[in-house]
Structure formats: C-alpha cells, structure tokens
Amino acid sequence: MDEPMVDASGAQVKVTFTTTEADLQLPESKRQLLVPADIRRYGLSRVLNSESMLDTGSIPFDFLVNGSFLRTSLEDYLTNNGLSLESNLTLQYVRSLIPPVYEASFEHDDWVSAVDVLSASSPSGRWSGDNFQRGQDRILSASFDGLLRIWNASGQVIATSPSGSHGGHTASIKAAKFLTNSQLASAGMDRTVRVWKYTESDHFSGDLKPTLELYGHTGSIDSLEVDGASKRILTASADGSIGFWSTSKASAPEADSSLLPNAHTSKRRKVTTSVTAAQRGPLSLMPIHSAPASAAVFDPRDRTVAYSASQDHTLRTIDLTTSTVVTTHSTSHPLLSLCALPRGNSASPLLAAGTAARHITLVDPRASAATTSVMTLRGHANKPVGLCASPRNEYALVSGAHDGTCRVWDLRSVRPATQEEGGLGSVSEAVYVIEREGAKGGKKTVAGEGCKVFGVVWDAELGIVSGAEDKRVQINAGRDVVAE
C-alpha cells in the first residue's frame, strides 16, 4: 500500500479503489490507500491521476460509494451515513460527466418539434461513408409550421423545405431524421412520411427536394426512426400502428389508393402541386397497439428487430422479417418516448421509456428477464417526450420533457426507492439539468409553461441539441460531457 497522505487535522480514511473500465485498472498493490478525511472528488481525482497511481495526467473522475456519487468530503459522507473514520470505503471511479455548457440558440417562426444532427460521428455521417466531409456538420429541425430547416453550426439556415403546395408537408411535422448527408426523412400530422434529397451548391446554400411520399397511416405520425445502411424507416402513429418502410421507390410497394391526397376530392377540387414525388406504401403496417403508438426504434445491433412503445402501457419487441410481435412487456403507465441503450457485449439493449407519470423507466426487453423494470429515473416535473443515448458512454442518456428541461442521467448512480416512490426497485436521479436559456430566472405557474421540450439528440461533435415550444433550437456543448 502507498505511503499515507495526511491532512491538517491528521484524520485519515482507508479507501479501496475499483473500476469497471478496463483501460483504467490499478495494480492490486495500489488499490488500497489512506487518504485525508477531508478529501473530496477533485482531490481523489488528483490522487488517481498521479504518477504513482494511474499516471494519466488530468482525467476528471467521479466516485461512486454504494451506488451514489460522492458529493461531499469523505468525512462528511461517513458522518451522514453513521459510519466511523475506521471504516474502509470502496470507491468506484468512473470518467466524469462534465456539465454541458450553453452555446447557442437558433430562432424559428413556430414551435420546434424535432431535431437531428449530421456529423462525422453521427449515425447518418457514418452511413454517408466517404461522401461526408469532416467539418460540414449540419443540424436538422422540424417545426409546427410544416417546414424543415437545415442549419450549419454557426446558426445559418442552409436550406428550407418547400410548403405543402410545392410538395412539402401539409400540416405540422412531428419527426425528422438524416439518413445520409444527401437524404433525410420526415413525418407528421398530415399522416405521411416524406423522403427528401438534399444537395448543397456551396457551404452556405442548399436545396431540399421531395422524392418519395409514403402513405399507410390513418393518424398523426409522431415518431420516426431510420437506418441509412438498409434504407429503412420505422414510424409510430396515433392510429396504434407501427410502420416499416423503404426509402427506395423500386422496392416500396404501391400505396393504398384510398389514402392518397386526391382519393376523396372531387375533380373540381383536385389537389395540385408544382412538384410530383413518387407515392408508395409500407413494407409492413402493424396495428399492434390498442392506443396511440408513441415511438419505435431499431435494435442497435440487429436491424431486423424493433421495439415500440405506446400509450396502451406496453412495450413490444417486433420481428421485422415476419412483422410479428415477439414479446410484450406491460408497464404501469402510458409510454410517451423510447430509446435503446447498447449494453457492452450483451446481445440485448436496455430500453429507456418516458412515461405519463413523469419518470423514465428502464426495461430489459428479453423474454427471460426476471422483472420488467430494471430502474426508474426520477426528476422531471412534466412528461419526458424525448430520449437519446449518449454517443460515447453506455451508462448515460439525455431526456427532454414538457417541464422545459433536458436532463443528463448516469445509470451508475443508483439508490433504493423510498416508501413515497413505492419502496421497490432502484432509482437514479439526473446528474445535470439543462434549462431553456430564455426561461432562466422566470417563474412559471406550470412546469415548462411556454418552453416545453419536444425533441433532443446527443451528438459527439456538436453536443446536446434540443427543440422546444420556445421556437428555438438550443445547443449545449456536450463534446466533453463524458470526459475522455
């Protein structure tokens, strides 16, 4: 064991350092140490980074004690938990989550319903292959005014989609995603999915051209997920159905003629547009929910598997090759949002689902799972309607909610549920809260009044990007939210 460190009072605490991070393991002989009782997180980080320990320079660390992050001195922790200075504390060290810092806001004419990012490290950037040029990051926003906008990182609008009379959406857009740097998809209250070709003549101006209209849903489409590699789209609709679509005109089946825009319009009132895009139907339309379907996502490792969440309280696993439900997990509340969290080498992800009860429930979708809910994330004061996994850390995710905040969660920080919370299972609380910049300091009679967050994405290059009722896209630097 290393030589003991002594503080001014002379009090010391024996600690044992552990970690699950393979590249940060200490030799067995260095894992136990006597440290000053008044030492805090920063001091412990310095100890670990020192030449005699990890010799890692200046990596910021957080420390978990019995599942909770250390936020006081060791002495205060011992006192607060009824422990003596003679106790041997086991400290699990992890790379810190660094506070996301506000960077910019992009103004819109109406509420911003959805956002996405195209960057070198984003899924769409990777699907673009060599066609994507590093440094040409783009932000996609969808709005209740029925328009899509593509921005550069400096806040300049590069392209805006045409209006409904020119081939665009005829009602509010609820979801939008980049497929590649030259293709994107959107969907909304006009019950259609639209695929767009995106081109740039230079780095400051571009063009969005509708190439495909997909018909099948009979209700608003509130969620859209894409896989650029397989050219497939998943949708979740208020009609209770999950849609599975192709972005290729050649492989997409014909659309149901009764759902096309002119199907119920007299010859005198035919809807005409100046742009004609091909009209197609779904590869599969699965009416598997008894209430509005809120979200659908692909399995991170197996794109033939999908998961859906619904206001009917269920989360379902779908085999896309046969369009059948494999498993159904029932929950206690209507589900409003969904994201899949990859788990190390595990074949199955962990699913995070936002609920109408204002919390986020983590679900193990495996049929063999002993319990449906693995953990509950608590802290939002209104409905969490947007979720996104960290691009770099399998334990972290961000949520956006109608309380006007985005919250960053670290799943390694866990405590038992209190009696007020039902007394069962594990609970995690947000490590950081991101407020809307324009609402800071203002008092709201209802949580999130005027600034409800509708969508959020976490990108390794640009950070945490969110869209809200305040008619703004907000960027909070997140490149180093997870310390390297």
Swiss-Prot record:
InterPro entries (alphabetical): G-protein_beta_WD-40_rep, NLE, WD40/YVTN_repeat-like_dom_sf, WD40_repeat_CS, WD40_repeat_dom_sf, WD40_rpt, WDR12/Ytm1
Ranges for region Ubiquitin-like (UBL) domain: 13-95
SMART domains: WD40
Molecular function, one GO term: ribonucleoprotein complex binding
Example of a GO biological process term: maturation of 5.8S rRNA from tricistronic rRNA transcript (SSU-rRNA, 5.8S rRNA, LSU-rRNA)
The WD repeat ranges on this chain: 122-161, 168-206, 216-255, 288-328, 330-373, 379-419, 448-484
Disulphide connectivity of cysteines: none
Keywords: Nucleus, Repeat, Ribosome biogenesis, rRNA processing, WD repeat
Pfam families from the UniProt entry: NLE (PF08154), WD40 (PF00400)
PROSITE patterns in the cross-refs: WD_REPEATS_1, WD_REPEATS_2, WD_REPEATS_REGION
Compartments, record wording: Nucleus, Nucleolus; Nucleus, Nucleoplasm
GO cellular component: nucleoplasm; PeBoW complex; preribosome, large subunit precursor
Biological function: Component of the NOP7 complex, which is required for maturation of the 25S and 5.8S ribosomal RNAs and formation of the 60S ribosome.
Family matches, as PANTHER family: RIBOSOME BIOGENESIS PROTEIN WDR12 (PTHR19855:SF11), WD40 REPEAT PROTEIN 12, 37 (PTHR19855)
Subunit architecture: Component of the NOP7 complex, composed of ERB1, NOP7 and YTM1. The complex is held together by ERB1, which interacts with NOP7 via its N-terminal domain and with YTM1 via a high-affinity interaction between the seven-bladed beta-propeller domains of the 2 proteins. The NOP7 complex associates with the 66S pre-ribosome. Interacts (via UBL domain) with MDN1 (via VWFA/MIDAS domain).
Family to which this protein belongs: Belongs to the WD repeat WDR12/YTM1 family.
Protein name as annotated: Ribosome biogenesis protein YTM1
Organism: Chaetomium globosum (strain ATCC 6205 / CBS 148.51 / DSM 1962 / NBRC 6347 / NRRL 1970) (Soil fungus)
